[in-house]
Amino acid sequence: MGFQIEGVIPALITPFTDDLKGINEEGLRENVSRLLEAGVHGVVPAGTTGESSTLSHAEHRRVIEIVVDEVNGKVPVIAGAGSNSTREALELSTYAEDVGADAILSVVPYYNKPPQEGLFIHFSKIAEAVECPIILYNVPSRTGCALEPETAAKLAEEYSHIVGVKEASGDLDVVQRFIEETPDDFILLSGVDELTLPILAVGGVGVISVTANVAPELMVEMYEAWKSGDVERARELHYELLPLHRALFTETNPIPVKAAVELVGMASSPPRPPLKEAREDTKELLRRELKKLGLLPEGG
């Protein structure tokens, strides 16, 4: 397996124009630049946090293109390229590969609830269409069905460039089953910020993170502390960050994180309908937690 990634990988928000009808391209570039300066280990454009479900196909492609260009090889770009239509997932995946994404993140098809055999067919077709590394994305709370570890193991055995999984079930037992069932070099990335440290402890190698949009340095510090063997410091940071992790999920993601990104002075916007702007009590909670961590700009 050639592709390796570990560490803190922000799942980028997509900032929209004021009327929500277009992408704030300059703001997206500024956000990526800020996160690179903070030392993140990769980025994910056009995922759940990036509102892929309400991007047009042209916008989805453009977001990937912008991020690949702005990153310019500094860290891996893992492009969100999933869909509940296998045909559309193929189109997005081949486009992401063509414009230079280092890997693709391919979500379990949502809404139509395929059986495991259907998931195997879906991901097999994607693997046969691209040569770039593929990271599977298991998030049953958003998709309505789960990728079983045994299915992931079959896919990894059949296709050497299916290299890992973003595991966002929130169930540590499921995480451990993925690690037990898949090859030793299969990458497991946490998809739940508050479980990052526990998942590292059982064999995960990093996190595709919502929190890292607003607290990238702290997330990187926690990971680096763990990696260097300073478990006590990693644990301290884990508990310091927990209230913020929780605050970022008091409403449907990415409603809170888009408010938080604005609070820390980065480019943001409300989400597109059918999501909406964060409630005032959510904004106040976020403001308090960000302030505790010293993340608000002066006067914020």
From Swiss-Prot:
Binding site residues for pyruvate: T49, I208
Active site as annotated: Y137 (proton donor/acceptor), K166 (schiff-base intermediate with substrate)
EC number from the UniProt entry: 4.3.3.7
Pathway: Amino-acid biosynthesis; L-lysine biosynthesis via DAP pathway; (S)-tetrahydrodipicolinate from L-aspartate: step 3/4
GO molecular function, one term: 2-dehydro-3-deoxy-phosphogluconate aldolase activity
Keyword tags: Amino-acid biosynthesis, Cytoplasm, Diaminopimelate biosynthesis, Lyase, Lysine biosynthesis, Schiff base
Family per record: Belongs to the DapA family.
Subunit structure as annotated in this protein's UniProt entry: Homotetramer; dimer of dimers.
Name assigned to this protein: 4-hydroxy-tetrahydrodipicolinate synthase
Species annotation: Methanopyrus kandleri (strain AV19 / DSM 6324 / JCM 9639 / NBRC 100938)
